[in-house]
Amino acid sequence: MIGVDIVSIARIEKCVKRFEMRFLERFLSPSEIVLCKDKFSSIAGFFALKEACSKALQVGIGKELSFLDMHISKSPKNAPLITLSKEKMDYFNIQSLSASISHDAGFAIAVVMVSSSN
C-alpha cells in the first residue's frame, strides 16, 4: 500500500511560531525534534511523512495509530526512515516500510510504501 501527503511549509511555520514546543511535541518525539534542527521545511516533511504513513495503513491518525507510534530517523546517507512500534508493526502485519520526502515551492511532500504479510 502507498500513502502520500503534502503540507504547506508556511502553515507549519505559523503553527510552530504560535504554539512552539506544544505543537511539535504533539507529533514528534524528542529525537525527531533534534533531527529537524528548527528547520520549518524539515518539520513539515516529518509531519507529511507521518500522515502519509497513516494513509498507507488506511487508518489515518486516531485510535489505531497515533503520531507518536511512528518514528522517523535518518539513514547513513541522510534518507528518511520510518518505523512503527513493535506493537503496531505486528498489529498491521507490516514487513517493511519505505519512505521519501521532498520539498519545493513552499511545500513538503512525503510518500510511504508499506509491505505487509497479508
Curated annotation (Swiss-Prot):
Pfam families: ACPS (PF01648). The keyword Cytoplasm applies. Its cofactor is Mg(2+). Mg(2+) binds at D5, E51. It is found in: Cytoplasm. Keywords: Cytoplasm, Fatty acid biosynthesis, Fatty acid metabolism, Lipid biosynthesis, Lipid metabolism, Magnesium, Metal-binding, Transferase. GO terms for biological process: fatty acid biosynthetic process. Coiled coil: none annotated. It comes from the Bacteria. Transfers the 4'-phosphopantetheine moiety from coenzyme A to a Ser of acyl-carrier-protein. HAMAP family: AcpS. This is Holo-[acyl-carrier-protein] synthase. It comes from Helicobacter pylori (strain P12).
